[in-house]
Amino acid sequence: MSATDPIQRVETLLQPILDAMGLELVELEFKKVGRSYLLRVFIDKPDGVNLDDCAEVSRELSVQLDVEDCIASRYTLEVSSPGLDRPLKKEQDFIRYQGRLAVVKTTELLKDEKGSPRKTFLGFLEGVEDGEVMIRLKEGPQARIPWDKIAKAHLEFEF
């Protein structure tokens, strides 16, 4: 069983549930753990999700998964918030979290304003402009990272 088929089917079942509750799908994971699988669903909303949101999505999705029987193997369903180190995947995420500390990793070496090459950028999100994510680095200079050069990005918790 390929991991992409169940993910697509789960997302199709999940999206109407989330839409009805005013929630956003942040990420879906489906991976083999021992002899069974783990289906992990990360959800969010502007003012954050709570335990009741997670429980309701879990109940609703469980019913749909049982009815549709789209995962043939044994699995465990987990529904949670994306946490403090929330992944940033969509352009809207970078806009929504302007001013927040984030880590952006790129697919290749890029230069910041001072010409220093790097693949990891730690700084404060300043938005998106002309297909580039703008980030004010903790050490001062700004970097503009082309959208297609972003390998991975997530919020970073500030102590």
UniProtKB/Swiss-Prot annotation:
Pfam families tied to this protein: DUF150_C (PF17384), RimP_N (PF02576)
Cellular compartments per GO CC: cytosol
SUPFAM superfamilies in UniProt: YhbC-like, C-terminal domain, YhbC-like, N-terminal domain
UniProt KW keywords: Cytoplasm, Ribosome biogenesis
Gene Ontology biological process terms in this record: ribosomal small subunit assembly; translation
InterPro entries from the UniProt entry: Ribosome_maturation_RimP, RimP_C, RimP_C_sf, RimP_N, RimP_N_sf
Localization, UniProt: Cytoplasm
Function: Required for maturation of 30S ribosomal subunits.
Family: Belongs to the RimP family.
Protein name from the UniProt record: Ribosome maturation factor RimP
Record organism: Trichlorobacter lovleyi (strain ATCC BAA-1151 / DSM 17278 / SZ)
Designated gene of the protein: rimP
